Curated annotation (Swiss-Prot):
Chief site of localization: cytoplasm
Residue spans crossing the bilayer: none
Modified residues (N-acetylmethionine): 1
Protein name: Protein sprouty homolog 1
Family named by the database record: Belongs to the sprouty family.
Compositional bias (Basic and acidic residues): 69-78
UniProt entry keywords in alphabetical sequence: Acetylation, Cytoplasm, Developmental protein, Membrane
Species this chain originates from: Homo sapiens (Human)
Domain commentary: The Cys-rich domain is responsible for the localization of the protein to the membrane ruffles.
Compartment(s): Cytoplasm; Membrane
Amino acid sequence: MDPQNQHGSGSSLVVIQQPSLDSRQRLDYEREIQPTAILSLDQIKAIRGSNEYTEGPSVVKRPAPRTAPRQEKHERTHEIIPINVNNNYEHRHTSHLGHAVLPSNARGPILSRSTSTGSAASSGSNSSASSEQGLLGRSPPTRPVPGHRSERAIRTQPKQLIVDDLKGSLKEDLTQHKFICEQCGKCKCGECTAPRTLPSCLACNRQCLCSAESMVEYGTCMCLVKGIFYHCSNDDEGDSYSDNPCSCSQSHCCSRYLCMGAMSLFLPCLLCYPPAKGCLKLCRRCYDWIHRPGCRCKNSNTVYCKLESCPSRGQGKPS
């Protein structure tokens, strides 16, 4: 019986033909092997041609691991062969994009893609790409730089350290001035009866002592005599006659005076040292007499003042 008479004049038959297994394996092998590009010497460029120096220790920023680009594989589709029964001829049409164009009157099943063909190759490539990403992503932890301190916000301003003068006047405590001399009416505590010295200060960035004693020694060249006696003495403990060259109680008194007499021929300013030393002692006594607030009596009775309104600085005798 004629097939045209059975199915009618407007019917069509679609036959789906799949490629053989040998052709699939051969095509998969050809797609996996990609030709590698060979670069010439002119195309090769130096990545880092210069050194980069930094002022301090720094951590090199490592580039982020690049993910391996996934290779898009064009999967094969089934070969759709439409057969027109009316005209008795075969029209084969292969679609590479997964869509088959059929005549308007023919309605046949269309298979878009076949995922079973490249399953083995895609699973192998995915596993290799994931392993490479895992190795690149595991970077060693950065070690802290020794001596590096973490930055902290300063909340308190630095304060200037104020050093009080050792010979400065101390604050008077009214509770200490309770022992009053019965004869002169002045305080007999240790602070008030201590002798007052001439004022002095530090000059030249706190390196030189400026006082009346140093002015007398440098003005009369006595500092030079002390330096010579210091280098000639054998006493290493520091208690030598170089500190007091004019002292009569220490050893080598005659030799010291003879040496200073010989040096006065070349340094006549040494002859001014005895009168300058006498003037210095007189100035000390005058300054102490004026500025000492305590009692100077040698033999006197002491009265303890219990009243808060009693005079503590010799304003009057206590009753």
